[in-house]
Amino acid sequence: MEDGSHCLKFFTIGLFCLSLVSAHRVHEYDKHPLSKFNVYKTTLGFRDSVIITANPLILGSKGEDTAWVTVDLVNPDPSDDDWVAVYSPANFNSSTCSVENDEFQSPYLCTSPIKYKYANFSNANYNQTGNNTLNFQLINQRADFSFALFSGGLSNPVLVAVSNVITFSNPKAPLYARLAHGKLWNEMTVTWTSGYSIDEAVPFVEWGLKGEEPRTRSPAGTLTVEQNSMCGAPARTVGWHDLGFTHTSFLTNLWPNTVYSYRMGHILSNGSYVWGKNYTFKSSPYPGQDSLQRVIIFGDMGKGERDGSNEYSSKDPGALNTTDQLIKDLPNYDIVFHIGDISYADGYVADWDQFTAQVEPIASTVPYMVASGNHERDWPNSGSFYENTDSGGECGVLAETMFYFPAENRAKFWYSTDYGMFHFCIADSEHDWREGTEQYKFIEHCLASADRRKQPWLIFAAHRVLGYSSNSWYAQEGSFEEPMGRESLQKLWQKYRVDIAFYGHVHNYERTCPIYQNQCVNSGKSHYSGTVKGTIHVVVGGGGCHLSEFTTAIPNWSIYRDYDWGFVKLTAFNRSSLLFEYKKSRDGKVYDSFTISREYKDVLACVHDSCEPTTLAS
């Protein structure tokens, strides 16, 4: 996402530092909604006359990981500023505060809720009657829940009453499966979350060919995140939430294009088993295999609230549109790339649970590959290229833990992966990419390693716009790109004949002509045949976060722009034919498209600084 300054730290030979500040402003909707709650100023004003009750007491009795809860309010002294917060764990008073949260005078509260609604939600008569019934949707987050009624609004909160405690029947259950490619083409990883430490239960995945026996059991590794591994507030303070245990298992030696079934399990110390849901996935085709292959790409989605909790209505208003459209279209694609700004937790750590629950129908069925964005990584003095606070103190730790990706070093969020006729080079725009850096060397090696006879479709992706965008603040800066974005990389895109480069960060959709050094090198708009001559750059940051304005002047390289939420679908029919489609999330219809038709000799053709050395010697 675009908020936070574009304050960029880089080093020259003399270790000279320069900060670049963008022209755009941080808007109110850029802030995490929970940041509006002045936690430390909370005072106590318990009233015996106020009643707040939650039902049912036990959730998920049939194994569900999501449940609806009814909260009834009776308040003899209601006001417009009353609001109801959801807390988990249920005990949220000062006894749970860490030393780092302590101020000169210890506050009563030191943690933010998971979400909230105003007490008059959907009932205009609350201010007169003091009675209302609120419905909340909860997910299993490994702890019990309570509901708190506050008066005084978000800035001067007064805690008035706390409800009874409710809980899921098994808070520790294995949940929220998410698939990703391993480092080998015939390897799939399964990552999930549970409340079981390795001291009390052994995690594994049971899997095999769908409908066949015997089944294989593969062990899982387990990672945890501690509060002191966060780099700053709010992740390290009021936004902290225990994420339990993250398990990852590697399913190896898969047959290509084959359907498998799987389920996560834990063996308890008494020998009994706890099982997760049953899922299926289709393994990847062999690199270069000629078959129908379909890819989804987008960025900047975030999370939504299906119960109408109003704090997310302006921050990530399109998140559920995109999620629901992808769930609906699930049989018609094979892999997803979410290229940065994943959950927009921004240091309110419980959002990571809620995001993995939101995308679970997708991520449990097809590989869900992620990239790093500013809202995952950026934090001052933490090694990020940009010296801003957009990650809310997470400094990359949570994204690196919650999702698997086949990088050599998870703290350096760049990697390559294959899917049949596609070769993907995923860059990390939150680390230095310029010539001479470690990442630049990776990018060149990744692009150079593509066997274009077998894998003709070469795709580059990064979160920030390292190519072209006519977004309003880039236009104000006069760059139409992230500062220094394409300066080093465009010669690599041209040399290795990258077909399409994708970016997020800017919350809209835009497609360029095939371009090199700011000049269109092909006059086509809807169909390209033979030698394309340049890379097509696509901004696809309309995954769900609030939208970004375009500049009013349209550059000559901008073919199509759309101020809406959406995603891109690539379909490779064979090694000679590729279909590109941009779909709106609201209806799933195609609003922009083009095709590429070519042969292997067209990829080899000498054009614009992509010519191999030759000799006249016989």
Language-model-detected regions and their locations in the chain:
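Extended, solvent-exposed regions of the mature portions of secreted/cell-surface glycoproteins
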Residues: 2-7, 12-170, 308-313
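Substrate-binding and catalytic surfaces of secreted/luminal carbohydrate-active proteins
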Residues: 564
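Metal-dependent phosphoester/phosphodiester hydrolase catalytic core
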Residues: 169-539, 543-550, 559-561, 569-617
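Eukaryotic intrinsically disordered and solvent-exposed regulatory patches
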Residues: 53-58, 68-72, 120-122, 131-136, ...
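Polar low-complexity intrinsically disordered regions
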Residues: 1-28, 179, 183, 220-225, ...
